[in-house]
Amino acid sequence: MEFEKLAEFAKEKEIDLCIVGMDDPLVGGLVDVLEDAGIRTFGPKKNAAILEGSKAFSKDLMKKYDIPTAGYENFTDPKEAIAYLENAKFPIVLKADGLALGKGVLICQNFEE
């Protein structure tokens, strides 16, 4: 994303306040770029937006600080994930890490799903 161009545009048009609401630009750091350019901005900075952008990060953070959350496992190796699912209790909720526009959650009733 070309955040610097957005900052230039906002300065040229003398925009008083930018409200950043979409996940991708928030996680990408648009708020940081706009604020660094001296533009008043409403929205979380990149280091806070990661809470929305990475469920794995969020869950790990909750676990670290004893914040109640549903049980979870993180996998980077598909074979390990499959091995886990072979012995898992169903139904089970699966979510790939990262942004999916609210559509990245699967509720599987059995291993085949």
Place the predicted regions along the sequence by residue.
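Active-site nucleotide/adenylate-binding loops and adjacent lid/helix of ATP-dependent enzymes
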Residues: 51-113
